[in-house]
Amino acid sequence: MVISGKELAAACKAKMAEQVKTFPEKYGRLPHLVVVLVGEDAGSVSYVTGKTKAADEVGILNTTIRKPADISEEELLKIIDDLNADDTVDGILIQLPLPKHIDSDKVIARIRQEKDVDGFHPLNVAALWQKQPCVLPCTPKGIMKLLKDSGVELAGRKAVVICLLYTSPSPRDCS
C-alpha cells in the first residue's frame, strides 16, 4: 500500500490557515514562530526554509535567527531566555542538530514548555510517555494521522519504528 500525504497536507494547511485567521481577534496580533538555526548544515537550512515557507502559507508570522556554528552555549541560552520573555513570541523551535560543543538537552530544556513547538522539552516528553496532554512531536503525530485518514486499521498489527531523532516516541504514543 502506498499512501500519499499531499491531500492530508493540503487539508491541514487549510485548517491551520483558518485557525490563524481567528488568532488576531483573540490576541490582537498574528501568532509568531521563531526558529533558531545554528550553523550552515545544508539539511538544516533546507528544513528551516521549508518550515518558514509553510508558516508563510498559513499566515503565521515567523522569524529565523541564524547564528554561526561557533556561537557559545551561553550566548544561545541568552537568546532563548530573551525569546521566552517576549510575549509576542508564541513558539520557539531550535533546529537540531546543534554543534557538538553545545548541550542540546540543556538548550531544549531552557525553552518554556508552552513555547516548545517540537514537543522536545523534558516536561512535554514526560507528559507524552505518561499519556498526558502535551505538545506532540510532529513526525509520529503526522504518521498516525496519515494512517488514520487513509483507513489503515492498526489494531492487532505490529510495527517497528526506527528513529534517529532527538526524541523518539513511537507514533502509537501520539494517537
Language-model regions, residue ranges each:
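Single conserved hydrophobic/aromatic residue that forms the stacking wall/gate
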Residues: 166-175
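Short beta-strand elements in bilobed, periplasmic/extracellular small-molecule ligand-binding domains
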Residues: 56-67
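Short, solvent-exposed amphipathic alpha-helices that sit
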Residues: 19, 45-58, 168
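Anion-binding alpha/beta catalytic cores of soluble intermediary-metabolism enzymes, centered on
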Residues: 93-159
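Positively charged, low-complexity intrinsically disordered leader regions
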Residues: 1-25
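Short, well-structured alpha-helical segments in soluble
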Residues: 75-86
